[in-house]
Amino acid sequence: MVKCTPLLALTVIVSAGSDALSDPTVKRLAKLATINQAPATQSNSDSKRVLRASDVPDEVAAGESRSPKSLWPWEVEDKLAPLKEKLISTSADDLEAGGSANKNALPMIWRWLWQNQIETKKTPIDEISKEVQTAMDLISSQATHEELNKAGVSVSDYVKALRFTLSDIDVVNRGMEYNIHLGNK
């Protein structure tokens, strides 16, 4: 099977003419070329990540622009790698946990990150819930994690409140801290 390289895809597109961009086959070639030229990142075990066609959103393969707030899965993992390492190496006392709770936390935190959709656009101010408004008020008053917990602020609402003023990666940082504080290890 011939590997679709960026050069091969470009050659096919150019030879097919200017109308080729609307052709499904050409879109597929562009998608494969995108996958093959995407920089491989390395995991903790120094093994290269294998990018699949499903990793590339259809709208990106079709040439449509993506939101600057949107992160590809491997971009998110690259940004979170230092946080994950810190979590693993943090002492049990610092996490108010014990034993192997540190490593057991990682799958749960990963699910939580995607459930809260860090790439989602900010919610319009007039559509926020009472719970999120409460979280926003507490955050603006520099409330501690204990005070947030006593007020019944959930991690999800806390993250939504943070999203109004912070960048995505800072939301992840603070959201993870609160998540760990609540004992979700």
Swiss-Prot record:
Residues 1-20 form the signal peptide. Keywords: Secreted, Signal, Virulence. It is found in: Secreted; Host cell. A motif (RxLR-dEER) lies at residues 49-66. The keyword Transit peptide does not apply. GO terms for cellular component: extracellular region; host cell. ATR39 has 2 polymorphic alleles that are highly conserved among Hyaloperonospora arabidopsidis isolate. This conservation is in stark contrast with other characterized H.arabidopsidis effectors ATR1, ATR5 and ATR13, which are highly divergent. The presence of amino acids 'Glu-168' and 'Val-169' in ATR39-2 blocks recognition by host defense protein RPP39. The RxLR-dEER motif acts to carry the protein into the host cell cytoplasm through binding to cell surface phosphatidylinositol-3-phosphate. Belongs to the RxLR effector family. Secreted effector that acts as an elicitor of hypersensitive response (HR) specifically on plants carrying defense protein RPP39. The allele ATR39-1 is recognized by RPP39, whereas the ATR39-2 allele is not recognized. This is Avirulence protein ATR39-1. The lineage of its organism: Eukaryota, Sar, Stramenopiles, Oomycota, Peronosporales.
